[in-house]
Amino acid sequence: MPIKTGRLLRISAAALALTSGAAAAAQSDLTVALQLEPPHLDPTSAAAGAIDSVLYSNVFEGLTRFASDGSIIPGLAKSWEISEDGTSYTFHLNAGVTFHDGTSMDAEDVKFSLDRARGEDSANAQKALFAGITDVSVVDPLTVKVSLEAANGSFLFNMAWGDAVIVAPETIENIKTNPVGTGAFQFSNWVQGDRIELTRNADYWGTPAALESATFKFISDPTAAFAAMMAEDVDAFVNFPAPENLPQFEADPRFQVIVGSTEGETILSTNNKMPPLDNVKVRKAIAHAIDRQAIIDGAMFGIGTPIGTHFAPHHPDYLDLTANSAYDPDLAKQLLAEAGFENGFETTLKLPPPSYARRGGEIIAAQLRAVGIQTEISNLEWAQWLEQVFRGKDYGLTIVSHTEPMDIGIYARPDYYFQYDNPAFQTLMTDLRSQSDPATRSAMLQKAQTIISEDYVNGFLFELAVPTVAN
């Protein structure tokens, strides 16, 4: 199921650059700035793309990984066999792989990692990726067999997620502050509120990193981000938070500006169980009250692509459904009146730190106010957002970019933070997993896109672009 996963924000441009010989030819160290600091350093127990931006592929690796064209290629597993009925996968691991603490990585570690991810007490934010696993058995030290309850055409894809990396049981107790993986870089230091430092893994089993060290610097304020780049305090800023400054960088021969697309569906996430947002007419009214292009222009200075469902526009199975939620404030007012809210209502709008959320939130609040919906805005730090919104579901509206690869399946999870419960959609997603025919899968994915678009589960805003400024 190849997609353009090389464009993922989760597989950050910074992460990819760290092992690039060309990128590092003139220097032995690199300082990359990011706006978001990870809440902790365990990618298997948090829904924070900020963790993967630093650690995925650099420190931690999975059985499979994404190639630059989005296809699935070997990772820690050098090869695999799939049973005729598609219900078992036998992975053959690379020999000589060690964790950064010097211990060997073997089939027992794979079993531990997958069993931990799928266990009843699992804190993995993407636990659904592992739900179909019925057994993980060690065949020999370099061979592991994974049995599934039913064929799953997405299984190898799922194993490439940052949530599916392989960890060692001996180091799991301190993983949130001292992560130990198998990657080309190993964790060195975390000065919270400032930076994370990685150093080259001299014993890496694969192609060695070109850099000796890499530092991820966290700069949340757009003004400070601009100042840091102009002073050349950092070598690159991935997802630069002040797009209004990009023309100035483009005109300066010291810098280059690279704008890439992502898998990041930026949405006005809606609590589907909180009245009156549990009323589809109210959600539809919100959708028609939003001028997406005005948000892209005002918050992102024109960088971004409007969407009408939770699917990346560059995906071959994408269906353009933006007309379903076209800007129409008069229709929004009519729908509110039909739902019994002629005079509008009040709700909360809780915003995480990214600029697209903070800036976009102010614009959306004004657009909703114009049709009678009053929002109480709260600006949250990332850890607060994860606790209150993602885990606690204590919100009415929020804005966030879902950067996981082709993650429309989250709408089949009633316990997910927007609490959408549609049995027909859940059945469709279950049936999709057992399908391998490309045409059939495409039709099912387009049907899924249509269902959530017409149910107005969330306000679908735009596909996040990633502007990177580098020296």
Identify the meaning behind each predicted range.
Residues Q27, V191, A289-D317, S355-A365, ...:
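Detector for C-terminal structural segments
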Residues A33-E84, D115, V180-T182:
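N-terminal lobe/hinge region of extracytoplasmic solute-binding protein
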Residues E37-S53, L76-A77, T103, A125-Q126, ...:
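A structural "hinge/loop" feature
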Residues S71, A151, F157-A209, S213, ...:
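Gly/Pro-rich hinge or "lid" segments in bacterial periplasmic/extracellular proteins
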Residues K78-A123, V139, K145, P276:
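Aromatic- and charge-enriched surface segment that lines or borders ligand/interaction sites
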Residues H92, Q126-P169:
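Surface-exposed binding/hinge segments that line
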Residues E173, N201-P247, A365, Q374-E376:
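Ligand-site clamp/hinge motif
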Residues R200, A251, I258, L277-A366, ...:
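Append "and occasionally in soluble cytosolic enzymes with long acidic Gly/Pro-rich linkers
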